[in-house]
């Protein structure tokens, strides 16, 4: 991907690929995920669990740490979010606890330090996204989306979606 320029400098932040190894040893791409890319949180949790359960084995295997990947993801989202009044707020948008990857959403939200929100937690007013809190509305500067784009805005995309935020797109 070296030398590729994205339109308006907007790059894809997260991409996941489901791989399978064939009996002859070749790798095959089974699925290509850019919508709600999952897997990184599971890899993180797996490493944390194994490092606590088998600390000597984990050290001896010299497993690559993922902290730098997550720090880069977090820093990139904060850096490229539009500047506004007050501190930059990035949220992780999830379809909710009935989604098969909700565990990962909750884990990533906590690890990255971003509030975990559902569509009902957000509102759009005057072209800006706001997080509804007990203390009032807080401006949202960036959204790490963990649901397919077609479900994000029931006004513009899928009128049957109860997961999105009216006016988000």
PLM features: residue spans?
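Domain-scale recognition of functional cores that engage charged ligands
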Residues: 1-169
């Amino acid at each position: 991907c070296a030398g590729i320029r994205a339109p308006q400098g907007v790059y894809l932040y997260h991409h996941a690929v489901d791989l399978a190894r064939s009996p002859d040893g070749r790798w095959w791409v089974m699925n290509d995920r850019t919508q709600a890319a999952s897997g990184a949180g599971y890899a993180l949790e797996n490493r944390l669990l194994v490092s606590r359960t088998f600390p000597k084995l984990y050290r001896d295997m010299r497993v690559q740490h993922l902290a730098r990947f997550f720090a880069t993801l977090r820093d990139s989202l904060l850096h490229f979010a539009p500047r506004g009044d007050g501190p930059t707020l990035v949220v992780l948008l999830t379809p909710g606890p009935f989604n098969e990857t909700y565990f990962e959403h909750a884990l990533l939200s906590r690890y990255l330090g971003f509030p975990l929100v559902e569509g009902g937690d957000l509102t759009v007013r005057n072209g800006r996204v706001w997080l509804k809190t007990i203390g009032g509305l807080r401006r949202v500067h960036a959204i790490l989306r963990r649901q397919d784009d077609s479900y994000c805005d029931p006004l513009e995309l899928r009128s049957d979606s109860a997961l999105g935020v009216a006016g988000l797109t």
